[in-house]
Amino acid sequence: ETGTDVTSFRIVSFSESGFSAELVGIDTDNAVVTVNFLQTGRFPVTMNIRMGLSYKATSTITDQYGAGAVEFARVEDKPFTVTAQNGETREWTLRTTYMPQLQNADFERWANLQTPLPKGIKGSPYWASANMTSPVVVEGTTQTEGAPGQGKAVQMETKNTIIGKLAAGSLFLGWFDDSNPMGNMNDPAVMMFYGIPFSSNQPIKGMQVDILYHPGNGPSSDSGSLAIELIRQRDLSQELEYHGANPDGTWHSKNNADRVARGHSIVATQAGTLDNGDTADLVVPDNTWQTVFVPLEYDGAYPAYTHLTVTFSSSSKGDSYKGAVGSILKIDNIRLIYE
């Protein structure tokens, strides 16, 4: 210790609801304490802290016992001074960032065996699945056990239906319109409303996720898909309607938003061209938990966006009703990775 060091930092509470934050780190060389807001409510807000210092040092943001209260009008930096016992001073910065993570991305909270919380519904989108309801009672997305010591996870399974069409297990950020499933069988994309409002003050590099994959009928029989997308709504006065692309790759005619960045990976247990025509860029051991990274790609400068979605499917060509019955994709511990 040099006499003017910050040795520890803990966030105790906030004066307002809707806020959460985590300590990123203490950079002694550059005299910076970095805190990341995971969730923000209505500013201004007071962050109550406990901060450890060098022996008998004091600071301008804490009392003699190390307790302090720092008010923020926004996500902003706050300078403070640490004074050593001998009177030496050093200027520090309490740096804040806003790099939120997805709610319940470790999938420990469920309403029931089929519905992770928060549940995506019209007007309040979040975790949703095309398997939440079906005219043929397909329960392809369910709660399962994660890797050892990791609690609960999500399992997506590709199944047959009584009407002869294959149904892939799916999960995405948004909401699913189950009002007319039989009438929309020729346009399944129209039932998926992708996207949740999202913002950060740092660019997103991609997403990290724990996965387990098992193809239903041998190594070449099927592949799963993992994707992350940034979406920009054209007119913010309207309600977002974004169905992504049709199975043939064309954009859905009802979209009122544009995809401005995407990361997409095909996961399989075998390299090369698979029976469904896809080629995996993530080749993993069968039925074994792995941590993978899906990079976000875009042209030019980092794009402005209004919404974000992530999508997962146990059969990567499931929107074309292609795949293998019994294919399983398990996911857990999704984490957005920032630059």
Locate predicted features.
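Extracellular carbohydrate recognition
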Residues: 286-288, 302-305, 315-338
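Extended, low-complexity, turn-rich repeat/linker tracts enriched in Gly/Pro/Ser/Thr and Asp/Glu
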Residues: 213-222, 234-237
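Extracellular carbohydrate-recognition regions
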Residues: 97-134
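Extracellular carbohydrate recognition and processing domains
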Residues: 239-304
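Beta-rich interaction/scaffold domains
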Residues: 1-103
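Short carbohydrate-recognition loop motifs
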Residues: 143-182
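Extracellular/lumenal carbohydrate-interaction signature centered on repeated Trp-anchored short motifs
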Residues: 172-207, 282-286
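Extended extracellular/luminal ectodomain segments enriched in beta-structured repeat modules
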Residues: 43-44, 199-208, 219-223, 303-307
